Amino acid sequence: MPRALWTAWVWAXIILSTEGASDQASSLSCDSTGVCDGHSRSLNSIPSGLTAGVKSLDLSNNEITYVGNRDLQRCVNLKTLRLGANEIHTVEEDSFFHLRNLEYLDLSYNRLSNLSSSWFRSLYVLKFLNLLGNLYKTLGETSLFSHLPNLXTLKVGNSNSFTEIHEKDFTGLTFLEELEISAQNLQIYVPKSLKSIQNISHLILHLKQPVLLVDILVDIVSSLDCLELRDTNLHTFHFSEASISEMSTSVKKLIFRNVQFTDESFVEVVKLFNYVSGILEVEFDDCTHDGIGDFRALSLDRIRHLGNVETLTIRKLHIPQFFLFHDLSSIYPLTGKVKRVTIENSKVFLVPCLLSQHLKSLEYLDLSENLMSEETLKNSACKDAWPFLQTLVLRQNRLKSLEKTGELLLTLENLNSLDISKNNFLSMPETCQWPGKMKQLNLSSTRIHSLTQCLPQTLEILDVSNNNLDSFSLILPQLKELYISRNKLKTLPDASFLPVLSVMRISRNIINTFSKEQLDSFQQLKTLEAGGNNFICSCDFLSFTQGQQALGRVLVDWPDDYRCDSPSHVRGQRVQDARLSLSECHRAAVVSAACCALFLVLLLTGVLCHRFHGLWYMKMMWAWLQAKRKPRKAPRRDICYDAFVSYSERDSYWVENLMVQELEQFNPPFKLCLHKRDFIPGKWIIDNIIDSIEKSHKTIFVLSENFVXSEWCKYELDFSHFRLFDENNDAAILILLEPIDKKAIPQRFCKLRKIMNTKTYLEWPVDETQQEGFWLNLRAAIRS
């Protein structure tokens, strides 16, 4: 029994493990190009069943703890492997041995406490390696990256345990585009550890304290293009002039990101600018200045300039003691060579006039997202301020008057580009004054609802996007580029107002159409962006847009951003794909064709009615309907005649002199109804015929060639035909006065023809000896 239980337990474990592996494999989603996504799937191991078809594998943000030698051995074509944000603590020696095509490897933020060079010995084409955020203290006992000749991006270190950098650590690396070292607790830096790298385009250093910063600078200053310092407290930073003064430098850019300064350490950094002569650009991003700006007692006055720095960028500068801050007059002399300054989102409300006057080389000034107003701008743009300034950006400040803003900037004689977007101007005056060389103006997101002659006529580029404009009727003879998206325009501007326009972006308005003629009127237009509008996909619009093969070269957002809004059955479709029916596009032609078809149908109907006696059928139908209103069969008391006689006028002699004499003078006499004698004068002939036939017991037809051609006889025969058809009786008596071909009786009298074919009729004998028998038979037929 225990053995049976043991066997069952083993099989259960095998089944569960198989199901688990199957579940993990199924948790990957792979596309046809070999890109497999398995991130954030709660995987605790690398899925089995991976093949050579996998080219990119993302297993980040899972719970994987172990990478074995066989886990990836079939992925011989793998180029990208992401294993970041797992719990990996062990990677076997040959885990990546078969990945000879691997170019991107991310092992960041795991639990690796030891690194092995054997992991990378076959990764000759590896270009990107991220080892950040693990638990190792050093980069291994041997040179870790000596087998990676093509490595371009390397990220190493962590924020806690990584404390040592040794000379062997980066041996074998010659050129790096980016090197990131996270070493907040760095305690040991062996000189020349980074010296072996001949060129580094961008070095990112995470250092909590600046103790070893100068030592690192000594090693890299001749091989580095850009140094970025992150998360560092520079309160105790001291720059040693002797350490770098005699060395050639290649550093062109310094970036300080989330760095804390004091007045003292800031002066030390300024000294660095002087001695590292190659620095052209300095950037401070999200930094904090823990001081009051009192640099006079710190020998800053002995520094005459900022070295060769031409570009200064400051973003999100925090000054906790802002209200105690000095006037910065001590740094004015340092700014003479600076050409480009950006101070963004730093609560700047004023640039002192003296500082503006010292910025004699300044060509570009960006004061976006600050607190500048017309009152403070007046002081900043004082006489002789920024004499060579060409571009001024005052985006998202507190400017309110467009007229006053333009007037205050008249002192800037060389200004040609002005960005005052995202200020609340609301309206535009009729006239304004601007610097004489103004060529570019940005008024986007300023809530203006109309444009006036306030705009300078010298403009070549105008941006009025994201406002409340519903029309554009300004004459700007030199304008080359117009940006007017996200407004309320219903049509394209008049080309005669903009004779040299080459670029127009007018997307997301309420334009519903434009024509070939409109586009052709812009003779120099090369770029048009008009997507995101509510286009009415009319036949003309579709014919124009779908028939112009070269349209895609002008419409930069064609075809995806051009969608139909109407008609409803094509709403949401791309204009390029929309199709309308023939009736929608050629309505006049369709109506004309329909009218012609209707005329032909009527003509054909008329011909057929004439050919097949359709008019007769309609007349008889009307007569029959009238007859249907009356009793189906008249009561006996309404029968006034023994017989109604239908005959041709040309046969009247035989009827009136022979038949009437024989029947009405017979004893007992027969009462006959003759149209000449008994029809009621003034009554409609059809009614006379109907009444006479209905009041007669029988109807006698005296058939002859004359009868067939008689119009009167036709009416009598017509209604009699309907009576025979409707009542199905034998009230008709046919007398053949002379031999007549049955074919002479019209085809439409099918019932009468049938009677002649199936029943006997009386034939008037030419032989007088047989005439007495004829009358005898006729009287018998009438009585029947």
Curated annotation (Swiss-Prot):
Mode of membrane association: Single-pass type I membrane protein
Which ranges carry the LRRCT domain?
Answer: 525-579
Please tell me which positions the record assigns to the cross-link Glycyl lysine isopeptide (Lys-Gly) (interchain with G-Cter in ubiquitin). 754
Positions in the Cytoplasmic compartment: 609-784
Fetch the Gene3D superfamilies from UniProt.
Ribonuclease Inhibitor, Toll/interleukin-1 receptor homology (TIR) domain
SMART domains recorded for this chain? LRR_BAC (SM00364), LRR_SD22 (SM00365), LRR_TYP (SM00369), LRRCT (SM00082), TIR (SM00255)
The principal localisation class reads: membrane
Against Pfam families, the record matches this protein to: LRR_8 (PF13855), TIR (PF01582)
Quote the record's domain comment: Ester-bound lipid substrates are bound through a crevice formed between the LRR 11 and LRR 12.
Name used for this protein in its record? Toll-like receptor 2
Q: Which species does the entry assign this protein to? A: Bison bison (American bison)
